[in-house]
């Protein structure tokens, strides 16, 4: 809330304070499955659906921040060595919780671990590598590609389905293909400096945002 108040003070804009408690989160779970037309990310989906439904009561178009972390390297797997070197999709390293939802015989028949490894190798082989890159630079380029190819698509689909279900048009400016194409080839040392992620993005808004907002640590959601 202090950051919101600072923003209001700086820009004198009109904002509504929306809050989602556990009960509201729970009530929106089944509607979130309907909105996505398949099982999803439980509370992550239901909280987004809840807020979209509230926003749509007064506004029919909204700007969102989807894709900034995927493009500018905001996730830990871009800069934490142990995650960077881990085999497999960094956002889905353990299939055990998924298998626990299935009967043992069904889990064995599906072989989710094998399928995941196959898809990872297949996708990794298609990453557009740069001649002369190696080591961590090459690994980050591969992870960046995997983020755009898989993780980002999941978030865009989730936002589109959830917002449309709520009669809200959500626009995603960071997903502009011109931004993605340009930033994908920007050297890592320009995206991450002095232990701070998304440095390039922060620098781009350094003359627009107050320092306390510009350098605020990312807050997990929900």
Regions found by a protein language model. Give the residues of each.
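Short Ser/Thr-interspersed hydrophobic loop/turn segments at strand-loop and sheet-helix junctions
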Residues: 147-161, 183
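Conserved cytochrome P450 K-helix E-x-x-R motif and the immediately C-terminal K′/meander segment
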Residues: 156, 208-209
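PAPS-dependent sulfotransferase catalytic core
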Residues: 209-222
